[in-house]
Regions:
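Non-DNA-binding regulatory cores of transcription-related proteins
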Residues: 62-141
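Short amphipathic alpha-helical elements of helix-turn-helix/winged-helix folds
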Residues: 6, 23-28, 40
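Pre-recognition alpha-helix immediately N-terminal to the DNA-recognition helix
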Residues: 19-24, 36
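Short capping segments at the starts of secondary-structure elements
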Residues: 14-16, 28-33
């Protein structure tokens, strides 16, 4: 799905800046922060402000077009993949990896639904040291 269509599908009025931000999120699966998106797009969009990037990413998250990740206490990151999945944050290199959701996630969601609840969000975060940093024997002190 193109970014323009995705915005419409989530009741977000498309603008040049919103399309650019959605496109960036969809093309860069790196879980970027507001600063990452702003730094990448501002050279080609001189009128883009960091506030616009923040407000747009927040709107995309609120409308279900993106996920807001609060796995890192210092940054908020965003993910265009809104399917049920987990995230792993490497405490050394700060890379965020996508992972399969725990097998119990769907089971728990079904149980809550059977009890009359409506689940709107589930977040599964893991933190540790990634295999690349372990390979390089990098330690957190």
């Amino acid at each position: 799905m193109e970014s323009y269509d995705r915005l419409l599908a989530h009741n977000v009025k498309p603008s040049m800046q919103r399309i650019a931000i959605m496109t960036y999120l969809m093309e860069h699966r790196t879980h970027p922060s507001v600063d990452d998106v702003y730094t990448a797009l501002s050279p080609s969009m001189p009128t883009l402000s960091k506030t616009t990037v923040y407000n747009t990413l927040r709107l995309l998250s609120e409308q279900g077009a993106a996920q807001m990740l609060t796995i890192d206490e210092r940054n908020v990151n965003f993910d265009a993949d809104t399917s049920l999945h987990a995230h792993f944050l490497c405490r050394k290199c700060q890379h965020i990896y996508d992972m399969d959701a725990p097998l119990s996630a769907t089971k728990q969601e079904n149980k809550l639904a059977a009890e009359g609840h409506q689940v709107e969000e589930m977040h599964y975060y893991y933190k540790g040291i990634c295999k690349n940093c372990l390979k390089e024997n990098i330690r957190i002190d």
